[in-house]
Each structure stands twice: as structure tokens, then as C-alpha cells.
């Protein structure tokens, strides 16, 4: 791919590479979030349909959406700080649920 870059298509190719890298990071963070939630959730207040969720689709749909900005903040901040547990990113879980129905 690097050999195909020229002054005409450089912006398009670099934008695509950056978008793909961000999408991979979102999928990775969602996988971690869902795994942590599944392993630590003792209440059944939120039921996640883990088997029917396509994380690639969730990541792709989150681009170019003004509502995604606070969601990205909650997704990428650590769920744990020291020994004190924080709530598990409710906006991210709500987004996953909205794409699974």
C-alpha cells in the first residue's frame, strides 16, 4: 500500500489508514469492556446479548456521529483506577445494546 501513495491520493489513503486503526482500537476496547462487564457483573440490571453483537459494526457506526464523542470518552478511560472500581462505562454498553436489536 505504501508504494501506491502519491501526491494526489495521499490524503485519502492516510485517512483510510487512520480510520482503520481507530476502528481496530475501538473493537479492542469494546472487547475488553464486554469481557470485564461479563466477568464482574453480579446484578442483572443490564443484559447484554453478547452472542449477537458484531463489534466491527458497532465501531463503524460510531464514526461521524456527534453523540459518539462522550461515548469515546467513556470507552477509552480506564474502568479501574488503583484499588477503587469505577462504573463500567454505561454509554458504551448502551451503544452496544442499541446495535444488537
From Swiss-Prot:
GO cellular component terms, A-Z: mitochondrion
Keywords: Mitochondrion
Subcellular location field: Mitochondrion
UniProt main location, coarse: mitochondrion
Other information: A stretch of 270 kb of the mitochondrial genome is duplicated within the centromere of chromosome 2 resulting in the duplication of the gene. The expression of the duplicated gene is not demonstrated.
The protein's name: Uncharacterized mitochondrial protein AtMg01210
Amino acid at each position: 500500500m505504501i508504494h501506491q501513495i502519491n501526491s494526489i491520493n495521499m490524503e485519502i489513503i492516510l485517512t483510510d489508514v487512520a480510520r482503520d486503526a481507530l476502528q481496530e482500537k475501538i473493537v479492542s476496547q469494546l472487547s475488553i469492556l464486554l469481557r470485564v462487564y461479563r466477568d464482574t457483573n453480579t446484578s442483572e440490571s443490564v443484559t447484554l446479548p453478547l452472542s449477537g453483537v458484531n463489534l466491527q459494526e458497532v465501531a463503524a457506526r460510531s464514526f461521524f456521529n456527534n453523540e459518539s464523542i462522550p461515548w469515546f470518552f467513556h470507552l477509552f478511560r480506564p474502568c479501574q483506577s488503583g484499588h477503587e472500581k469505577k462504573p463500567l462505562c454505561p454509554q458504551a454498553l448502551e451503544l452496544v445494546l442499541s446495535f444488537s436489536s
